[in-house]
Amino acid sequence: MKRLLSYAGLLLLYIVGPAHAQQPLTLDEVIRLALENNASIRNSRLESEAAEKIRIAAATRYFPGISAGGLYFDANRALFELRTPGGDLPVYDGNPANLLHPTAFAYFPGGETSLLGRGQIGYLDIVQPLYAGGRIVNGNRLAALGRDAAADRSSLTRDDIILATSEQYYRLLSLEEKRATLGSYAALLDRLIREVGDALDAGLILRNDLLKVRLKRSEVRLDSSRLEHGRKLAAMALCQQIGIPRDSTLVLAGGWSTAAPPQRLYVEPESVLKSRKEYALLEKGVRAARLQREMKRGELLPQAGIGARTMVVKLDEGPRRTLGIFYGSLSIPLSDWIGGSAELEERRLREKIAENELQNSAELLLLQIEQAWQELSDGWTRIQLCEQAILQAEENLRVNEASFHSGLTALSELLEAQALLQKGRDEWTDARSEYMVKQCRYLQATGRSGDLH
């Protein structure tokens, strides 16, 4: 009985598992899974958190620095040793005349005194920087800039993943559309085989015509097999992209989203340039180079601060004593001015390089936007041409079918008309898929990644 229940449980898992795996996924769901499970997204989040920790650490430089320490020593010999020999000491008897020639003496025993043979010292320091050449302020600005740059890089990673996921989604969707088109073509050939077979039985056509149709049907079976293999690979690639177990039976839902005409999406390239994350990162690079130059300049300026120290000291057999010290400090790096001036000039040149990179990259970004627009426009034109070609192919097939049934057209012309229609539908599917991808690329190029899905 237990074994029977075990087999029943395994059978239930076998039935339920594929049903769950084949749950249709929409584009929004696919993108959501990719953003949740992609390793690059997780790493970009960690980088943002690390940059925030650096900013928090930099903010602590505004507060006093506190340090504590202690020292214990026990020497085999004291640092200072004082020996006093014994002897007779004159005693004053009250008569001034006897000062030079004492008549009474007292014995003084000799002795030894040791200092710093053993000791305990503990201290607590508090130092508040008053002026550090602007390095604390600029260091905090640089850390905040690094945090913002990490956020921009995270957004770029997110946009790239959305784009790559959308491309794979539309690639799989186009293969499913082609599979449906090929299935319709195969059904059309099957119907034609039956009609040609009936005509052959009636002696209206030659057997060669039936062989031609069957040969075409075999070609369609081969194409269908190749297409199915490609669809399985595309499905598994999409599963890997969105972080779920590989499943060649993955099913998509929602179909094609609305393809907006390119004119509805157009924006002036200059108006959206600064909304690009790449441009924002380049601007931050210029600001970072400027702050690094200021940081180097601060190293050449005087440093000032105040501090307090409390000490607890116990030396040898003496009592424990507590001392307090307040002090101020001023440091002027005189010897660093010569070499530091050259390093400061190097930082200035780095800043100029960053400015040149910003200008050059801005021009490249504008060119990228223009190229994305041209590709989008060409993609829309291709869709229109494919739709016209399908209408013409459908009309051509209708005419050839009527002529074939009337005995006015050869079978080869009918087969060619059917193949042209199937080819036109495949080209329309490719054009639609490519246009949706180009639409995503144009939205990303114009800084509108939020509209990708």
Indicate residue ranges for each PLM-predicted region.
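Amphipathic alpha-helical coiled-coil segments
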Residues: 43-58, 157, 161-180, 198, ...
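Acidic, low-complexity, intrinsically disordered peripheral segments
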Residues: 67, 76-80, 84-90, 427-453
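Small/polar (Gly/Ser/Thr/Ala-rich) solvent-exposed segments
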Residues: 42, 65-80, 110-117, 127-156, ...
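Bacterial Sec-pathway N-terminal export signals of envelope proteins
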Residues: 21-79, 130, 204-206, 246-290, ...
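Periplasmic alpha-helical coiled-coil/stalk elements that build and connect Gram-negative outer-membrane
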Residues: 25, 53, 154-273, 372-375, ...
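Bacterial Sec-dependent N-terminal signal peptides
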Residues: 1-27, 35, 453
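Transmembrane beta-barrel architecture of outer-membrane proteins
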Residues: 119-121, 167, 212, 303, ...
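Residues on the lipid-exposed face of transmembrane beta-strands in outer-membrane beta-barrel proteins
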Residues: 124-128, 238, 328-332, 431
